[in-house]
Amino acid sequence: MKTTIARLIAKENEFDNMRACALEIAAAVAANEPGNKLYAICEAGEPNTLVFVERYVDEKAIEMYRNSDHMKSLGRKIGATLAGKPEILFRLTDCT
């Protein structure tokens, strides 16, 4: 399994739009990506901030996610709400 934990910070007055886009992405992932085992969106307790936890069975599943039509369109949509690039906090690989 491959897990990524990332922090996204919204522009001023864009948090609600960012959160709505994040929920759209999570729904699209759940509906279309059998290689995804977890796509959690967490409010971080910091202003305008969400933390994403994404878990995939392997690199092939991650590539499918990155190249999916829904991620291309929704990725642009959420990108317009962000104050900067997403910050990757951790990349984890299960050893068992």
Describe the function of each predicted region.
Residues 40-48, 75-96:
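Glycine-rich beta-strand-turn "strand-cap" elements at beta-sheet edges
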Residues 27-30, 63, 79:
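Solvent-exposed, non-membrane alpha-helical residues enriched in polar/charged side chains
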Residues 22, 66, 75-78:
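Short, flexible helix/strand-to-coil boundary loops that buttress conserved ligand/catalytic motifs
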Residues 14-37, 73:
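Short amphipathic alpha-helical segments
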Residues 2-9, 40-66:
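Short, well-ordered beta-strand segments in beta-rich or mixed alpha/beta enzyme
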Residues 1-2, 96:
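Absolute protein N-terminus
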Residues 34, 57, 83:
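Short conserved AdoMet
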